[in-house]
């Protein structure tokens, strides 16, 4: 019996491969545990279409992330904070505050606080470079300008 593997099976093959197996093994183990489907033309074509659709979706998401990084690199985010006598801020600037200000000033950019990498807390005025990691090996840098109110 021929089956289409839905996931990697040790000593048999990888997901997406069509393998010849004994009827009992195919029906009682692979198909019963949803590790494979009976390899008909319809099932194979449907699987290939799903794989193609998934690849197109991933390519689109990657393109959107690259576009977001390009846009981020051109902006400077301004944050106004209260400052003490010695020039230090009352409290530090957090990832959450950066994402909120980014949404206020640039509504088209939708970053999550987990995407922002702060190496150390921002506790004084000045211009800082903030690293952004969007997954899939896509990273970028944008600047924030912390100004006294």
From Swiss-Prot:
Gene that this polypeptide is encoded by: rplI
PANTHER family attached to this UniProt entry: 50S RIBOSOMAL PROTEIN L9
Gene3D superfamilies: Ribosomal protein L9, C-terminal domain, Ribosomal protein L9, N-terminal domain
Matching Pfam families: Ribosomal_L9_C, Ribosomal_L9_N
Gene Ontology molecular-function annotations: rRNA binding; structural constituent of ribosome
GO cellular component, one term: ribosome
Protein's recorded name: Large ribosomal subunit protein bL9
Key word Repeat present: no
Keywords, alphabetical: Ribonucleoprotein, Ribosomal protein, RNA-binding, rRNA-binding
Role, per record: Binds to the 23S rRNA.
Listed GO biological process terms: translation
Matching HAMAP family: Ribosomal_bL9 (MF_00503)
Family named by the database record: Belongs to the bacterial ribosomal protein bL9 family.
């Amino acid at each position: 019996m021929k089956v289409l593997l839905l996931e990697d099976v040790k000593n048999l093959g990888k997901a997406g491969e069509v393998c010849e197996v004994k009827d009992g093994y195919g029906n009682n183990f692979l198909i019963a545990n949803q590790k494979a489907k009976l390899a008909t033309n319809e099932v194979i074509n449907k699987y290939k279409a799903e794989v193609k659709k998934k690849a197109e979706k991933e390519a689109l998401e990657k393109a959107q992330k690259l576009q977001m990084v390009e846009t981020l690199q051109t902006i400077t985010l301004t944050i106004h904070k209260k400052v003490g006598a010695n020039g230090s801020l009352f409290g530090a600037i957090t990832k959450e505050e950066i994402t909120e200000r980014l949404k206020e000033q640039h509504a088209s950019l939708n970053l999550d606080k987990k995407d922002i990498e702060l190496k150390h807390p921002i506790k004084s005025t000045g211009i800082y470079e903030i690293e952004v990691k969007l997954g899939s090996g896509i990273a970028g840098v944008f600047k924030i300008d912390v100004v006294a109110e």
